[in-house]
Amino acid sequence: MHNINEICKDGQSLPLNTEGNLRVVFLGVGAAFTKRNRQSNFLIIQGEHHVLVDCGTLGPLALDDVGLSVSKVQCYLPTHSHADHIGGFEEVALVNRYVSNSPNKPKMIIQKDYQGLLWTKSLAGGVEFCEAAQGQPLQLTDFFDILRPQETELLGRKVWSYQHGSMELVLMRTLHFPDSAVSIDEAQWCSGILVNRRVWISGDTMFDRDYPTQFSDISEVMFHDCQTFQGGVHASYRELMTLPDEVRSKTYLYHYNDNWDDPKAWVKDSDNFTGDPIKDGFMGWAHQQVAYDFA
């Protein structure tokens, strides 16, 4: 069972702890170039532990929206190397090393192969030459303490699992980009997340019917990447409408475009859906800056 609750009442900051229950807070629910929402980065909180999944170009602003900052968040998990998901990590690295005066580095949960890719192809250019560490350029480990998920198997898929306090985080690869990829093996690194084997968040992905259908068997609530147009590297609303009723009925849609609330702009007369996800059998559009609380 879950409830949707208001956060930051009377200007209060979002607490990074709970009384033991699982909480998911989307700092944003928008697509990469959104102007009406923040980007789809989200906090997972349980007990005394938390993790921010992705920190895009608008991530530091989105944290400020809820009274937080990149120095207050102490654990991060990047899913893939697109700017709306990792564009804020340079600020995370630099603020925590040079501005906040914290004695501790923030933590990063990251799979081994992706760690090298994230650093060499995205983050190193902005931060590795800030100083000489024993005569060598800085490395990711100079900015973050690395927490390593372990490879295992779930539902016949290779996944990576990390126990973060009382929350279990299971990462699975997704079929996101390039758009020519027809299998996970041909795709660049991108991951979705299963939390406590209860809450599944697709991560960025093209439409991959088996992916949500398979995880719906063990998930209470699901959040699926959704765009309002066809093509590209995200699942479209039209494609998601082909999922079984029992999958849609437990799925919220997120990572959507700025015209989500104007279905006349993207629903065709020939479509057999309304563009209102509740009427169309989903749980609805996911909302930013509210708490999805799980008992």
For every predicted segment, state its role.
Residues 61-62, 85-88, 117-118, 210, ...:
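Phosphate- and divalent-cation-binding pockets in alpha/beta enzyme and binding domains
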